[in-house]
Regions:
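Long, contiguous binding/interaction regions
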Residues: 2-93
Length: 93
């Protein structure tokens, strides 16, 4: 049964990704996320958008399920992309 604490144990990592140049990095970042899609439970993309302009930087927040090694591998793969910063956080309640 997945619920409450059990769910957090299985999906207890948050990965924050900062893209400093979305035009250059979006395709590669999307490819990496697609390859790791089975471990991504939630994805939230944040950037300044409007009718007159759209920011070239943005942040993606992911809830990661699986083993810590899988989350760390995704982290290192993303950090290897130029203009991309990433940080892994563990939710330990």
């Amino acid at each position: 049964m997945i619920g409450g604490v059990a769910m957090m144990e299985q999906c207890g990592y948050i990965l924050a990704i900062l893209q400093e140049n979305r035009v250059e990095t979006a395709t590669k970042v999307q490819e990496i996320l697609t390859q790791n899609g089975c471990n991504i439970r939630v994805r939230l993309g944040l950037h300044d958008a409007g009718l007159e302009s759209c920011s070239n930087s943005g942040m993606i927040l992911l809830q990661i399920c699986g083993e810590k090694a899988e989350a760390e591998n995704l982290l290192m793969t993303l950090k290897a992309v130029p203009h991309v910063k990433a940080k892994l956080m563990s939710l330990d309640f």
